[in-house]
């Protein structure tokens, strides 16, 4: 349920936003939430109850400010007796006035924003005090390099995320 360099915010060009969102939501329903020792599980619990409470607090705050939940939680089977098993969630209609989009939520949830162009995306990507990891998804390597050079981040990926190279030092 948690990854130190997992995707937290997604900015999508308005030209492909609707198609992207439909596919992303569809893929989110493929997660199998459960005991990480079970073979079919591909989404486990968050580390502790206080982490689950923090994640839910940030999501609920965003929802109270107008964010829209895209995932129907009733379509997931999960161990209800364990509150640290969080259903994955996709939030839209999010803004940077929401802590969900500017702080590290660190859970199985993501905010997706429509942007007009790469300049707006870069501005929003840099609107974070952390600048830990960024990932650009494109077919054009020159655009990825151009954006990557403008993003204030310690780690930059093209067409991948949360990847560790054994040749590089990584402390999480």
Predicted regions, residues:
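Glycine/threonine-rich helix-loop capping motifs at alpha-helix boundaries
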Residues: 1-3, 15-43, 57-73, 93-100, ...
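Flexible, acidic loop-helix segments that line cofactor/substrate-binding pockets
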Residues: 2-9, 25-57, 74-85, 102-107, ...
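Glycine-/small-residue-rich active-site loops that bind phosphorylated ligands and cofactors
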Residues: 4, 12, 139
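Short beta-strand and adjoining strand-loop segment in the mid-core
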Residues: 9-16, 90
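Residues in well-ordered alpha-helical elements
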Residues: 14, 18, 53, 60, ...
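Conserved donor-binding loops in enzymes that form glycosidic bonds
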Residues: 14, 45, 111
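Conserved C-terminal structural/oligomerization subdomain of aldehyde/semialdehyde dehydrogenase
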Residues: 78, 85-172
């Amino acid at each position: 349920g948690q990854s130190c360099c997992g995707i937290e915010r997604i900015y999508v060009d308005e030209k492909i936003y609707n198609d992207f969102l439909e596919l992303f939501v569809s893929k989110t329903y493929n997660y199998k939430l459960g005991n990480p020792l079970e073979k079919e599980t591909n989404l486990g619990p968050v580390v502790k109850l206080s982490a689950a409470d923090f994640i839910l607090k940030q999501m609920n705050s965003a929802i109270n400010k107008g964010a829209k939940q895209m995932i129907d939680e009733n379509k997931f089977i999960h161990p209800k007796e364990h509150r640290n098993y969080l259903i994955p969630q996709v939030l839209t209609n999010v803004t940077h006035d929401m802590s969900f989009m500017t702080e590290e939520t660190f859970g199985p949830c993501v905010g997706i924003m429509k942007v007009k162009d790469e300049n707006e995306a870069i501005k929003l990507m840099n609107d974070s005090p952390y600048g830990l990891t960024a990932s650009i998804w494109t077919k054009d390597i020159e655009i990825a390099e151009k954006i990557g050079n403008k993003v204030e981040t310690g780690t930059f990926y093209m067409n991948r995320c949360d990847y560790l190279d054994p040749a590089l030092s990584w402390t999480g």
